[in-house]
Amino acid sequence: MDYSRYHSLSCERQDQVLIVSLNRPEALNAINAALHTELSHIFADIALDQETNVVVLTGKGRAFSAGGDIKWFQDLTPPQLEALFTEARKIIVDLLEVQQPMIAAVNGPATGLGATLALFSDVIFAADNARIGDPHVRIGVVAGDGGAVIWPWLVGAARAKEFLLTGDLLTAAEAERIGLINRVVPAEQLMATAVTLAQRFAAGPTQAIRGTKVSVNKILRATVNLVLDTSLALEKQCFFTADHREAIQAFIEKREPKFTGR
């Protein structure tokens, strides 16, 4: 598979392991239009890639991903918003079509869609300085692009609602304690830890490994089918609210937003 058309994503092959890195380090890998579009294509390509047996997903620089780029949101036209949500659905659906094991190496902050990408991975390692959360509500929108699916799946409804409704971030240690991620490792050992496990998977009985992943993910796929369209529709509605506009303006003006519930 040729990944040379990707620029906001960096793809590096180590034998049968494909390392995919979000590649906007100057913006903490915040997801803008170009990166969002590439994310909506990459997983379908990986699913068809016969040279790749395992994927490691990480971020360039000091962040995994700071989530959606607020500067992108402030200028969205209605047609662009429609395209965004079409892509958002495709990202999650295509992620679940990837039969190869995917390991997230969370090397720094992972928030919003950034956190969702990590949490939909099969094994999640986080650096000891990483923080993880889904602060959609803090910009006045529903956690619609996968957060409402994956957080309850990993930590149960009660804990998921606490963190999704507040938008609070967790330390890597706290995320490990509640079962949101697999393991915290020292930052300098993160990639080595992820690649070592990836190589073990790649050298294993790949058909059995893939089949086991597909089987476990049947319940997750059913949850996506139940929740995702509703959560995305509710998130899209929020883009037209006064609260969302206030959150964007407050971000631009570097102040706390004053929400009115409208």
How does the language model describe each region?
Residues 20, 24, 39, 57, ...:
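Terminal peptide-recognition signature
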Residues 94-209, 232, 240-241, 246-249, ...:
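Crotonase-fold acyl-CoA enzyme core
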Residues 213-222:
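Short, charged, surface-exposed hinge/linker loops at domain edges
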